[in-house]
């Protein structure tokens, strides 16, 4: 082999190594289907993770015991609404939180919790007709928060509603519990039914969006969130944990991996992505970390003064289910209230539907 040929081979080898380092595609992420179990405070989640082919982003469907699946649930809803037999197209409006199924021009948004926890399906059609109201509220607040990050008192739509009064009410609750979170930097409205941030924006400007209208819709939805709900809390930030009633959906930032998404009902497991020069974390290890993270997060120690939204909501829910207090209002996390110190520490998220004084 001539000197020039050897030099060419060496150049190609170095080029290949460089490309591998840049693209990080030389470390294959190949995970076979596997059985999984998660034990969280006495509740056992079990099933099988199967590969779902998503180019460039390995995603695994976690099948849960006793759950029929989202598509089967959608077909039952279609039959209920008189659309049995029509062509069904699946569309993920927000892949982490929502499944939107479309029949023709008719939108039907729902949560699998409706069927899993026995909500009144006959009211879904009513929700479908009125859904633009709450969706509009959600879009407005999240757009303002993400786009401008204004202090909540400076957001025009808040000034036109009783939103500010309800925020002040929340701080009164926190103060009575001896918990100080500081002044919120900004506020985001969460659609408690399905996180529909991209829901049919053509309807957004066609309907009036008031809290009275949103409350009327939420009165329909509340049975979904009060039947069988163990915990419902949400946080926004770089380190994010969101526990939902039917789908224990956790997004955690860990060492050597990007945000991992795991569900325990309508389940997908997003395989951990490798970091620069790092080995991908095996799913079994990620699940073990997730299980440990869950158990640590949900433990509320006596005398805790720095309480995150997860711990606070869990404490409130335990008191509610244990009959320690019987409020005359419905509560659920609908506002995300952030302190000036950190956007990762949301305060209590609560809302009185009937306008009664919120005290326990």
Where in this protein do the model-derived segments appear?
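Preferential activation on post-signal-peptide N-terminal prodomains/segments
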Residues: 20-240
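Short, exposed beta-strand "edge-strand" segments with a Pro/Gly-rich flavor and a Y/T-containing core
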Residues: 48-71, 271-288, 343-347
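A short, surface-exposed beta-strand/turn
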Residues: 110, 126-127, 132-136, 231-263, ...
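Activation/maturation switch segments at domain boundaries
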Residues: 27, 320-360
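Segments that shape or occlude catalytic/ligand-binding pockets
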Residues: 169-174, 178-331, 336-339
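Gram-positive cell-envelope targeting signals
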Residues: 1-31
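Helix N-cap and loop-to-helix transition residues
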Residues: 162, 282-283, 351
